Structure formats: structure tokens, C-alpha cells
Amino acid sequence: MNFPNGKTVKKVREMYPAGCRIVLDHMDDPYTKIPEGTQGTVRDVDDTGTVIPSWDGGGSLGIVYGEDSCHKIHTEAEAKTTLDWYGKYQPEADSRCPRCGERMPGPKGRHAISRWADITVCDQCGTIEALEKAGLTKTLPMMEWFCIRQAQNGGGEWKG
């Protein structure tokens, strides 16, 4: 196996910053139990260019540069899967709205449930989503939600 040079490793680190969400395309390991299409959160890229994720289903088997492949989430379906996953781990109180990034004071149950994903959003975004659902305003693509944009562009892992 040939290891990538420092310039290549730097490029991989820029492509997959810590916190970004990825989808496994292929893993050339006959012993892995991680199915293609599984999503995870990038933790690091090591000095050999291996992308180290935390897979949503558990585990942290790395994606070896030149052997395996993955991509950052880039479709609405992939964004919805990520938002649904984030919703399972959303803080119970005083979190941030995943759609606009504003603080949501108080308990999670006091705010709106998104009409597009299984996650809680702030009251204002809940109202906007109701208008979107009624066809009265243009729908904001899930790839444009604050929590997706921030994580995909090097802002670190979304923690709500």
C-alpha cells in the first residue's frame, strides 16, 4: 500500500473537516459490517489520509485513502437522514434551532416539531415551515439548514 504525500493528506483534511457528515460508498474490507450508504460524522483525518468517522450505527472503522470511498452528504434525502439522526440526540433544553441556528430557550417540548424531519425547530421556523407546507412560500432545502451548512463547511460537529 502506498501512503499519500503531505499535500494529498492536507487536501483530504480540507475536503472532510471534523464534524462534516459523510456517506460510505465502498469499503474494501471483507470483514466489515458497515453497509454502503451508512452515514457518519468525521472525527479526524490521520497522517495517512484515512478519514476517521463515528458511524451512526456505532463503530469508527476508518475509510482508507485509495482503498475505500465516501462522500459528503449532498442530496436532500441524505440531509433528511442526517436531520432525523440529529433529532434523536437533540438536547432536551436550551438548544439551537437546526434550521436557522438561533437559540431555543427552555425545554425542547415547548418548541415546534419540524414538518420536514424528525427534529425540533424554533417557533419562528415552525411557522415558516407551516407556510412552506401550505405552498405559500418557497421551501428552504434541507441542505441549506444551518446545522447542515455549518458542519459541511468546517464549522465542527453540530451539537444543537
PLM segments and residue spans:
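Basic/aromatic-rich interaction segments and small domains that mediate binding to polyanionic partners
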Residues: N2-R13, P17-E76
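Exposed loop/turn and edge beta-strand positions of beta-sandwich/beta-sheet ligand-binding modules
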Residues: E36, P91, W116
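Short, intrinsically disordered terminal segments enriched in charged and Pro/Gly residues
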Residues: E76-A93, K133-G160
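Residues immediately within or flanking Cys/His clusters that coordinate Zn2+
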Residues: D94-S95, I119
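Short cysteine-rich clusters marking metal-coordination/redox-active sites
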Residues: C97-C100, C122-C125
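Short, non-ligating residues that shape and space the ligands of small metal-coordination modules
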Residues: P105-P107, L131-E132
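Short linker/helix segments within small regulatory modules
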Residues: K108-I119
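Short Cys/His-centered divalent metal-binding micro-motifs
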Residues: D123-K133
